[in-house]
C-alpha cells in the first residue's frame, strides 16, 4: 500500500511540474519582454516574435534618420549577430539578435518613412523572426 501511495504522489508531482511548465510557456507567448539593451520582443504563438526598440532607446538616440538591415528574409541569424544598424542624429547603434533565429521579414516600410519609429517606437516592429530554440529567457 505504501508503494501505491508513493507512485500516486510521484504522479501528482509530475503533473504539477508539467502544469507549471505549460503556464510558464503560455506566459511567454503573446507577451512583450524587454532586454537590457532597450529592445522589446513580442513573442507570438508558434515560435514567432516581433522585435523593436523602446521609447527610452529613441529618447537616448534622438531622432532616427536611417536604418540598415544586415540580413534578408530566410537568413539564419545567430545570437549576438548585428541584425540592424540604427543611425540617429547622435549615434549609430547596432541591434543584435537576442537569440538564434530565422529572419521572416524586415519592416521595409521604415526605409521610406521613419516617422512611426520616431513617434511610437513601442508600436513599430523592426523585424519579424522565428525562434530557433526555446531557450530565450530574461
Describe each model-derived feature in a short phrase.
Residues 1-12:
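N-terminal chloroplast transit peptides
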Residues 11-85, 115-138:
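Acidic, low-complexity mobile loops and tails
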Residues 38, 64-65, 96-105:
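Generic structural motif
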Residues 56, 91, 108-109, 134:
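Residue-level signature for short turns and capping positions that connect secondary-structure elements
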Residues 71-72, 77-78, 89, 98, ...:
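Surface-exposed strand-loop junctions at beta-sheet edges and helix termini
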Residues 85-97, 113-116:
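Short, Lys/Arg- and Gly-enriched loop/turn segments at beta-strand edges
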Residues 93, 99, 125-127:
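Generic beta-strand structural signal
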Residues 103-108, 112-116:
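PDZ-domain C-terminal substructure recognizer with occasional recognition of PDZ-binding tails
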Amino acid at each position: 500500500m505504501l508503494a501505491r501511495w508513493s507512485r500516486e504522489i510521484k504522479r501528482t508531482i509530475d503533473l504539477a511540474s508539467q502544469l507549471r511548465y505549460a503556464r510558464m510557456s503560455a506566459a511567454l507567448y503573446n507577451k512583450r519582454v524587454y532586454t537590457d539593451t532597450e529592445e522589446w520582443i513580442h513573442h507570438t504563438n508558434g515560435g514567432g516574435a516581433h522585435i523593436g526598440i523602446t521609447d527610452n532607446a529613441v529618447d537616448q538616440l534622438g531622432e532616427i534618420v536611417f536604418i540598415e538591415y544586415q540580413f534578408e528574409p530566410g537568413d539564419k541569424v545567430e545570437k549576438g549577430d548585428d541584425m540592424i544598424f540604427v543611425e540617429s542624429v547622435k549615434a549609430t547603434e547596432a541591434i543584435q539578435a537576442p537569440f538564434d533565429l530565422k529572419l521572416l521579414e524586415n519592416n521595409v516600410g521604415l526605409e521610406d518613412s521613419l516617422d512611426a519609429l520616431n513617434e511610437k517606437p513601442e508600436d513599430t516592429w523592426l523585424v519579424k523572426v522565428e525562434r530557433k530554440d526555446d531557450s530565450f529567457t530574461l
